[in-house]
Regions:
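C-terminal membrane-cytosol helix-exit motif in multi-pass small-molecule transporters
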Residues: 1-15, 196-204
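Juxtamembrane intracellular "pre-TM" segments in multi-pass secondary transporters
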Residues: 7-38
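Short amphipathic helix-loop junctions that connect adjacent transmembrane helices
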Residues: 50-66, 70
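Helix-to-loop junctions at the C-terminal end of transmembrane segments
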Residues: 80-92, 177-178
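Structural signature of the two symmetry-related core transmembrane helices
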Residues: 95-110, 187-190
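Helix-loop junctions at membrane interfaces in 12-TM secondary transporters
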Residues: 112-123
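Intracellular juxtamembrane helix-capping segments at the cytosolic ends
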Residues: 133-146
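A membrane-interface helix-boundary motif in multi-pass transporters
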Residues: 175-192
Length: 207
């Protein structure tokens, strides 16, 4: 059945499109370069959610309840991804992306200031809202900023840049956790998030 389905699918041939030979900043305008830069800055502070689960354990949550926190933010992220995507279609990508950063900034600040059960749960809710607003809108904004003939290649390059910055994020967070204290990774992430929000103000959306 799979063979029959794929045999009937015909890929449209690209016409008059020059193949993109590698990733080069020469093909990017300053606006897109700035957005890749700010996304990379944010990724440096976007450590793994595993730290949030460990943090909850350190705040007194029992081992059996920690998976509930994981389920909480994943369900929120899944439930709100579509509404945030629809909202970005109405009001633009930048406002929703700014909202996504704001959710995480508030979550990080909450983890710094409040270590009680209620504060941690609210932090996980905000983290879920952050993921719901960030993931669909960020890639969409990049795709709208790039020339159509380079779209797939630059999207791949964007993901590579984010991935390379995300790799040391958890390592840095772990070192800060061990050497400075539990709140140190959240301080760093909060500062980098605020910096990303400031840079985002200078990004111009394609109308």
């Amino acid at each position: 059945s799979s063979f029959l389905i794929f045999s009937r699918i015909k890929e449209r041939k690209a016409e008059n499109i020059q193949a993109y030979k590698g990733i080069s900043f020469r093909h990017l305008d300053d606006n897109l370069k700035l957005f890749i830069f700010l996304s990379s800055v944010f990724a440096l502070g976007a450590f793994s959610y595993s730290f949030l689960l460990i943090y909850a354990r350190e705040c007194g949550f029992k081992v059996g309840f920690v998976p509930v926190l994981y389920l909480l933010f994943t369900l929120i992220a899944a439930a709100f991804s579509l509404p945030f995507g629809q909202l970005s279609d109405k009001i633009g990508r930048k406002p929703v992306l700014f909202l996504a950063y704001s959710f995480w900034a508030l979550a990080a600040l909450g983890f710094i200031l409040f270590r009680g059960y209620t504060g941690v749960i609210i932090g996980f809710v905000l983290y879920g809202l952050h993921k719901a607003a960030l993931d669909p809108v960020q890639k969409t904004l990049v795709s709208e900023l790039v020339p159509s003939e380079y779209k797939a290649s630059i999207l791949g390059g964007f993901q590579m840049a984010i991935g390379l910055c995300a790799l040391p994020a958890s390592l840095i967070a772990g070192l800060l956790w061990d050497k400075v204290g539990l709140a140190a990774p959240f301080y760093l992430s909060f500062v980098l998030t605020i910096l990303s929000m400031c840079i985002l103000l200078f990004i111009k959306e394609v109308k």
